[in-house]
């Protein structure tokens, strides 16, 4: 998994509207890119709604937010509409970026093993360098932790 101080890798992912988001898109402001397993699941919904409810505060710090999962554009569109999300969700259907940064891993859930995205949040500076990484995110305390990191 990528660590603090490393450069976030080059990427090109579509958002829910089919617009391409790349390293150039995020350059010039701090960025939170959070990786989550799946739209419309309880914990993922709580996490997305927490970002929605705190977006104005992050924007005030010149921080942009993107969520990334393996869901399709259509699923992202539905998720955004259902919960009135106010930030972009990026499509990583083939898990290319998730694999490159090390968040696509073997997971255990209810005694079953499967490959998938492990909930992880990257905080990236204006030049694309990772300021910090929150691994094994605890959704209940993530916003508070991000506030401490971003000062």
Task: Place the predicted regions along the sequence by residue.
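Chalcogenol-based redox active-site neighborhoods
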Residues: 1-151
């Amino acid at each position: 998994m990528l660590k603090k101080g490393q450069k976030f890798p080059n990427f090109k992912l579509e958002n829910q509207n089919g617009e391409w988001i790349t390293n150039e898109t995020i350059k010039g402001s701090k960025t939170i890119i959070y990786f989550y397993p799946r739209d419309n699941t309880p914990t993922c919904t709580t996490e997305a709604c927490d970002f929605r409810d705190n977006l104005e505060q992050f924007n005030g710090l010149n921080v942009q937010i993107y969520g990334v999962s393996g869901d399709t554009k259509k699923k992202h569109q539905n998720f955004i509409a259902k919960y009135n999300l106010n930030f972009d969700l990026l499509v990583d259907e083939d898990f290319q970026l998730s694999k490159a940064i090390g968040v696509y891993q073997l997971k255990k859930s209810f005694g079953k093993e499967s490959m998938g995205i492990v909930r992880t949040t990257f905080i990236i500076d204006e030049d694309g360098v990772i300021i910090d990484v929150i691994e094994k995110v605890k959704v209940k305390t993530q916003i508070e932790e991000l506030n401490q990191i971003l000062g």
